[in-house]
Amino acid sequence: MKFTCTKNNFNNGINIALKAVPGKTTMPILECVVIEAQEESIKMTTNDMQLGIETRIPAEVQEEGIILVNAKMIAEIVRRLPDEDVNFEVDENNNILLFCGKSKFNIPGINHEEFPMLPQIDIEKKIAISQFTLKEMIRQTIFSISDNESNKILTGELFEINGDEFKIASLDLVRVSIRKIQLKESYDHIKVVIPGKTLNEISKILTGGMEDEVT
């Protein structure tokens, strides 16, 4: 496995991936990020078993491959690198060799096979709205989720699509918040509850741009 990318792109990608790395866990493997070199991009995957993140950055891939490494450690190393290209290599013993300018690091990697990868998503069933709209819908409703862990379903928000209507709702048995928008197309009825913690992290990742879409 071998690739080259800019320090800025690597730093941005790993910082997004860190949002799904648990602060404390009895499963050390969840403290890691899967780094996979594919064609002209690098895919980074993290999963704390409640929130999973998969993000991609552009790169020049000389040799495809996949490796697992402690996420916070690699993030801290990349953060301190000079603003130059990062050269990332993995040898046959899963050792990571990272070069950037005059800096050189030898980092222990891990076989990725035991990492809980994210499930495959049926991309045929999707809607697309602006990141600004979704960010605002979350902001306008998330304050009324419950913090009572004994009633888990109230600690999340209901996402419901019915025809051409998209609705987000939350309640804590005192307050109720509902936000609706009209979609450009009609879809089958579907609803799901998403944890408030997950939505907070998603909201931080969204740029909030009107031209940027999220699906």
Regions found by a protein language model. Give the residues of each.
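Structural preference for solvent-exposed beta-strand-turn elements
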Residues: 1-215
